[in-house]
C-alpha cells in the first residue's frame, strides 16, 4: 500500500525516498513546538503505511509555513507532500469534522463563519454595514460561488463517505 502512495506523491514531483531522517524538519517546525506535529514521522509513515498517515490527525496540524521545506538538507518538498497527503485523505473521505463543518458552511452561505444577528448588531454599533461587501450581501455572487463549488465538485469532496 505504501508503494502506491509513494507513486502518487512521486507523480506530483514529491519524492520522499531521499529523506535521511535528520529531524531538521521537525526541530524547526513552529507548529510542532506547540502540538503533536512531527513532520519527520509523517514522511516516514508516508513511506511505510498509507492508511495510517492519511488518517493521522497530525497531518492537519501543519500551518504550511514551509520552514521544514526551506531547511531540509535534501531539498524534500515536505510541505507540498503534506498538502498532497491532505488532498488524498479528503478524496478518501478522511476529512476532520471541523473541516467538514467549515466546508459545509462555505457551500451553504459562501463563508466559513456566517454572520449571526449578534455580529450584525455589533457591526452596526461600530458604524459599519451590518453585512460586509461579500457574497453574503450579493445573492447573485453567492449563487455564482455555489455554481463554481459544484462545478469543481467541492460538494462531493465534502459529502460524508
From Swiss-Prot:
Binds 2 [4Fe-4S] cluster. Its cofactor is [4Fe-4S] cluster. InterPro entries: 4Fe4S_Fe-S-bd, 4Fe4S_Fe_S_CS, CoB/CoM_hetero-S_Rdtase_csu, HdrC_iron-sulfur_subunit, Helical_ferredxn. [4Fe-4S] cluster 1 binds at residues 19, 22, 25, 72. The keyword Transferase does not apply. [4Fe-4S] cluster 2 binds at residues 29, 62, 65, 68. Keywords: 4Fe-4S, Cytoplasm, Iron, Iron-sulfur, Metal-binding, Methanogenesis, Oxidoreductase, Repeat. It holds the Pfam family Fer4_8. The keyword Heme does not apply. Its EC number is 1.8.7.3, 1.8.98.4. The ferredoxin/F(420)H(2)-dependent CoB-CoM heterodisulfide reductase is composed of three subunits; HdrA2, HdrB2 and HdrC2. This is Ferredoxin/F(420)H(2)-dependent CoB-CoM heterodisulfide reductase subunit C. It comes from Methanosarcina acetivorans (strain ATCC 35395 / DSM 2834 / JCM 12185 / C2A). The lineage of its organism: Archaea, Methanobacteriati, Methanobacteriota, Stenosarchaea group, Methanomicrobia.
Amino acid at each position: 500500500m505504501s508503494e502506491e502512495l509513494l507513486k502518487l506523491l512521486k507523480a506530483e514531483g514529491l519524492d520522499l525516498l531521499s529523506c535521511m531522517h535528520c529531524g531538521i524538519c521537525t526541530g524547526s517546525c513552529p507548529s510542532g513546538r506547540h502540538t503533536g506535529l512531527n513532520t519527520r514521522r509523517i514522511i516516514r509513515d508516508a513511506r511505510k503505511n498509507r492508511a495510517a498517515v492519511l488518517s493521522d490527525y497530525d497531518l492537519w496540524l501543519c500551518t504550511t509555513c514551509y520552514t521544514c521545506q526551506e531547511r531540509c538538507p535534501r531539498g524534500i518538498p515536505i510541505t507540498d507532500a503534506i498538502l498532497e497527503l491532505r488532498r488524498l485523505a479528503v478524496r478518501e473521505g478522511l476529512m476532520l469534522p471541523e473541516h467538514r463543518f467549515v466546508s459545509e458552511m462555505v457551500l451553504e452561505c459562501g463563508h466559513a463563519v456566517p454572520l449571526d444577528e449578534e455580529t450584525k448588531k455589533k457591526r452596526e454599533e461600530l458604524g459599519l454595514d451590518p453585512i460586509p461587501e461579500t457574497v453574503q450581501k450579493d445573492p447573485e455572487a453567492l449563487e455564482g460561488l455555489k455554481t463554481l463549488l459544484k462545478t469543481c465538485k467541492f460538494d462531493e469532496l465534502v459529502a460524508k463517505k
